[in-house]
Design a protein with these regions (language model features):
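Extracellular/periplasm-exposed beta-strand and loop segments of Gram-negative cell-envelope proteins
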Residues: 1-16, 53-70, 100-103, 137-156
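Transmembrane beta-barrel architecture of outer-membrane proteins
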Residues: 14-20, 42, 72-76, 105-111, ...
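Transmembrane beta-strands of outer-membrane beta-barrel pores
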Residues: 16, 25-27, 49-55, 97-101, ...
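Residues on the lipid-exposed face of transmembrane beta-strands in outer-membrane beta-barrel proteins
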Residues: 19-23, 47-49, 77-83, 112-116, ...
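Short loop/turn motifs that connect adjacent beta-strands in outer-membrane beta-barrel proteins
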Residues: 26-42, 85-89, 119-126
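Transmembrane beta-barrel strands of outer-membrane/channel proteins
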Residues: 45-51, 81, 93-97, 112, ...
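Transmembrane beta-strand segments that form the barrel wall of outer-membrane beta-barrel proteins
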Residues: 90-105
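Predominantly the C-terminal beta-signal and adjacent terminal strand-loop region
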Residues: 110-165
Length: 165
């Protein structure tokens, strides 16, 4: 990027750690065939925290570099719906909101995943999943020259592997 003839090269590193737990409100069969393990749906309430760390470097070529970092912890609550479509295939829809002025003023997350269970170390103890996720922050701290503002929405594909112990 060039502004007023000055070449600027930005670099942003973002680290995110989400930890939490869930409470299963219930699981319901989606099939009315007695004695059969058919499709089911489970609904969970979730709660936890989302830690965010950002490191920003602005290299003004020929002039110098500005850099800084910021980190904060957001409390989050949400809901998750898990559709067990077959013994191996599943669909998960989840979302959360948080911040509440503790870390961010507001943060949210929404995602959808398709999963496939398989045998890794035991019976159906692993799940390969892929889908799409969006994550947003509205974070502000400081004033004047010391003001830091992070109002960002990130979204894109997600791939992962989960292992159950």
């Amino acid at each position: 990027t060039t502004i007023n003839g000055i070449k600027i090269e930005p670099s942003i590193d973002l680290y995110l750690i989400s930890l939490g737990g869930f409470y299963r409100f219930g699981t319901w069969a989606l099939s009315n065939r007695p004695g059969q393990n058919g499709p089911s749906v489970s609904i969970d309430g979730t709660a936890g925290g989302r830690y965010t760390h950002i490191n920003v470097d602005l290299d003004f070529k020929g002039i110098g570099t500005l850099s800084g970092n910021k980190d904060w912890l957001d409390p989050v609550v949400g809901m998750r719906t898990l559709f067990d479509l077959t013994e191996r295939w599943s669909l998960t829809l989840d979302g959360s909101v948080g911040g509440f002025g503790v870390g961010s003023d507001f943060t949210w997350h929404a995602g959808g995943l398709v999963g496939y269970r398989f045998d890794l170390l035991g019976e159906k103890d692993a799940k390969l999943f892929g889908g799409y996720r969006a994550l947003s922050w509205d974070y502000e701290e400081g004033r004047g020259r010391d003001k830091f503002e992070w109002n960002v929405v990130m979204h894109g594909p997600i791939l992962g592997l989960g292992i159950t112990f």
